């Protein structure tokens, strides 16, 4: 095992749930404002998950006051407190970029049974 692999292995989180594109998740993010730290929840649909190991990232999309907001998080980031899975989505794609063009009910994803 290389030295970098050993460092990467020690930095991986073990509390990451199994989730994928189409799942609706609550990402609890640590936000530091001045000397205070608080937890902010970002709820949305996972539109992609890419990379592997310590470099793995996922992108969450939500509609906020009619404006689409996307945020990309590293899976193993220390700034993420925890991730809750709200619903499992039934999708046939690994990257859901087509959701960017859809609004309202058309942007809704069927729930996995």
Swiss-Prot record:
<dbReference type="GO" id="GO:0006412">
    <property type="term" value="P:translation"/>
</dbReference>
<dbReference type="GO" id="GO:0022625">
    <property type="term" value="C:cytosolic large ribosomal subunit"/>
</dbReference>
<dbReference type="GO" id="GO:0003735">
    <property type="term" value="F:structural constituent of ribosome"/>
</dbReference>
<dbReference type="InterPro" id="IPR001857">
    <property type="entry name" value="Ribosomal_bL19"/>
</dbReference>
<dbReference type="InterPro" id="IPR038657">
    <property type="entry name" value="Ribosomal_bL19_sf"/>
</dbReference>
<dbReference type="InterPro" id="IPR018257">
    <property type="entry name" value="Ribosomal_bL19_CS"/>
</dbReference>
<dbReference type="InterPro" id="IPR008991">
    <property type="entry name" value="Translation_prot_SH3-like_sf"/>
</dbReference>
<dbReference type="Pfam" id="PF01245">
    <property type="entry name" value="Ribosomal_L19"/>
</dbReference>
<protein>
    <recommendedName>
        <fullName>Large ribosomal subunit protein bL19</fullName>
    </recommendedName>
</protein>
<comment type="function">
    <text>This protein is located at the 30S-50S ribosomal subunit interface and may play a role in the structure and function of the aminoacyl-tRNA binding site.</text>
</comment>
<keyword id="KW-0689">Ribosomal protein</keyword>
<comment type="similarity">
    <text>Belongs to the bacterial ribosomal protein bL19 family.</text>
</comment>
<keyword id="KW-0687">Ribonucleoprotein</keyword>
């Amino acid at each position: 095992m290389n030295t970098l692999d050993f460092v990467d292995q020690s930095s991986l989180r073990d509390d990451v749930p199994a989730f994928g594109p189409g799942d609706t998740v609550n990402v609890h993010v640590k936000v530091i404002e001045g000397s205070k730290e608080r937890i902010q929840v970002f709820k949305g649909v996972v539109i992609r998950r890419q990379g592997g190991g310590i470099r793995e990232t996922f992108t969450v999309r939500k509609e906020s006051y009619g404006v689409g907001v996307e945020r990309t998080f590293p899976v193993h980031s220390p700034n993420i407190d925890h991730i809750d899975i709200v619903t499992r989505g039934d999708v046939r794609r690994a990257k859901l970029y087509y959701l960017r063009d859809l609004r309202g009910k058309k942007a809704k994803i069927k729930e996995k049974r």
